[in-house]
Structure formats: structure tokens, C-alpha cells
Regions:
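Well-ordered beta-strand positions in beta-sheet-rich domains
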Residues: 48, 60-62, 70, 178-184, ...
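Short beta-strand and beta-hairpin "edge-sheet" elements
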Residues: 170-215
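Small/polar beta-strand repeat architecture
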Residues: 2-10, 17-32, 38-41, 54-126
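Short structured motifs
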Residues: 125-129, 188-189
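Oligomerization/assembly interface segments of phage tail-like spikes and tubes
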Residues: 129-150, 197-212
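Short acidic, glycine-rich loop/turn motifs
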Residues: 15-17, 51-55, 170-176
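Short, acidic/charged, Gly/Pro-enriched secondary-structure junctions
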Residues: 152-182
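Short coil-to-beta transition motif at edge beta-strands of beta-rich domains
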Residues: 38-54, 161-167
Length: 216
């Protein structure tokens, strides 16, 4: 089987700009698949939705499938260790609104998440024993041509100064699916220019929770 590769050109990157009006959630299943039921939700396959009023299940999740009022979340969304909510009185679902594609990007660099290390050495240990600790989420560095007067780059500055946590989405080429997550601008837009060149800029988005991959 030939090696599969994923070209950079043709990738799409979006930032969340808001949410649709929240719709009432009337049911949730936690196993075998994570699903929610909401009449008139308006979500479609590939959307990123925000759940509120569901306690430990609150958060942003990609949509894998839609059947009438039933929304099935991505396979990576694992709720099997959670309890279904006892009440849906305040439960809502809203769909993320996206910016236009950030076409000025020339490089995307994602730092992987890392696991901390816990020392579990005891007096019976023959040496130092460790186990996996807490996850520290990585970051995404975007490098792009500097144009602070454009709507996209103005929004980056706004998000930084507002200390906003926002959704992001990257759609890959060659049927490799999409990545979804949330984060905040850790480093505001920098800039660099020189003679016979063009200004370049970049930002660092610190991930606030795990990301999710939704296959094509």
C-alpha cells in the first residue's frame, strides 16, 4: 500500500465567531455512543456544537451524524464513564459560527499534548517507578502574512485583549478529516519585515481542552 501523505496547500483553518441560538436538549445517551436529542437543533454533519447545562458533559463536540432530532457525536467523544444527566431543565445545544477560511496562513505548527509523570516509588520498589500523570495541552502556532487591517487579523487582536476562549477547526486534504478544539490567544500577533520582503506575523493558540478528530 503506498504511503499516504497530506498536502498543506488546500488546508482550511477557521476560528469561531459566535454561536447560534441555543436549543433545548431533551435526552442524552452516554453509551455505546455519545448522543443528544434536541428538536430543531439545526446542526449538520461536521458541525462543532456547544453543550451547556449538562454538568460534566458540558463542552464543545464535533457532529458525526444527524438523524432527525438525534445528534451523534464523534467517535473520540467518550462519555462511557459519565452518568446521564438527572435533569435537562437548563440543557442547551448551540452550533458554532465560523469565520472565513484564514487563507493568509503559510505555516501551521501544532505542539502535541504531553503527559506529566507521577512518582509512585515505594520502599518495595527496585528503582524509581512512575506512572502517567495529568495531561498538559499543547498549542498551535500560526504563521501568516501580516495584514492587521483585515477582519481575520483584527479578530485575533480582539480575542487576545478580551482573553477569549474560542473554538477552532482545521480541515485536512486527501480525505484525512478535520480537527476541532478550543483555545485562547497565548501570544498576540507579532510582526517582522525587511527590505525587499513582506511583513510576516504569527500567533500562538494555547489549547484549553483536548482536541477531537472527525474522519472524513
Amino acid at each position: 500500500m503506498p504511503t499516504q501523505t497530506t498536502p498543506f496547500q488546500g488546508t482550511k483553518f477557521y476560528l469561531g465567531t459566535g454561536l447560534t441560538e441555543g436549543k433545548t436538549v431533551t435526552a442524552v445517551t452516554v453509551k455505546p455512543n455519545a448522543t443528544i436529542t434536541s428538536a430543531g437543533h439545526g446542526a449538520k454533519v461536521g458541525d462543532f456544537i456547544k453543550l451547556t447545562g449538562l454538568g460534566a458533559l458540558d463542552g464543545y463536540y464535533p457532529v458525526k451524524a444527524v438523524t432527525n432530532d438525534l445528534i451523534t457525536l464523534a467517535d473520540e467523544v467518550d462519555w462511557t464513564s459519565q452518568d446521564a444527566p438527572a435533569s435537562y431543565a437548563a440543557a442547551k445545544v448551540a452550533t458554532v459560527k465560523w469565520s472565513s477560511n484564514f487563507c493568509a496562513i503559510k505555516q501551521i505548527e501544532g505542539d502535541g499534548d504531553t503527559l506529566g509523570e507521577e512518582d509512585i516509588t515505594t520502599m518495595c520498589s527496585e528503582g524509581t517507578e512512575t506512572e502517567a500523570g495529568e495531561i498538559e495541552y499543547g498549542s498551535i502556532k500560526l504563521t501568516f502574512f501580516y495584514a492587521p487591517g483585515t477582519a481575520m487579523q483584527a479578530d485575533l487582536r480582539k480575542k487576545f485583549h478580551a482573553k477569549e476562549t474560542f473554538p477552532w477547526m482545521m480541515i485536512l486534504k486527501n480525505s484525512q478529516g478535520s480537527l476541532y478544539g478550543t483555545g485562547f490567544i497565548q501570544t498576540s500577533p507579532n510582526f517582522s519585515g525587511e527590505v525587499k520582503g513582506k511583513f510576516e506575523s504569527g500567533v500562538t493558540i494555547k489549547k484549553t481542552k483536548r482536541d477531537y478528530h472527525l474522519p472524513a
